[in-house]
Amino acid sequence: MEFYLEIDPVTLNLIILVASYVILLLVFLVSCVLYDCRGKDPSKEYAPESTLNAQPSIRVVVTQHSAHASHWARGPSLHLKDPAPLGKKSTVV
């Protein structure tokens, strides 16, 4: 007596799809372990990563002029009792 299991084509396609995703996941995990999860080749030597203190600071300088003729050129603004004195402002990032 012959015994075989008949599988529906939709079920077979689903099994193949799940198996292919499992294989892709395993390949990804193995490559992640081999390449240190950062895309770097472990057989090569890389320079050490630079720290944040070694980066040069960026200085932003904003200059405001207090000419009355250019008031309407700047656009609408909110007027308060004591407007802040205009001048040179700088921010170090």
UniProtKB/Swiss-Prot annotation:
Record key words, sorted: Membrane, Transmembrane, Transmembrane helix
Region spans: Disordered: 70-93
Record's keyword annotation contains Manganese: no
Major location category of this protein: membrane
Gene Ontology CC: one annotated term: membrane
Its membrane topology: Single-pass membrane protein
Name recorded for this polypeptide: Small integral membrane protein 36
Organism per entry: Mus musculus (Mouse)
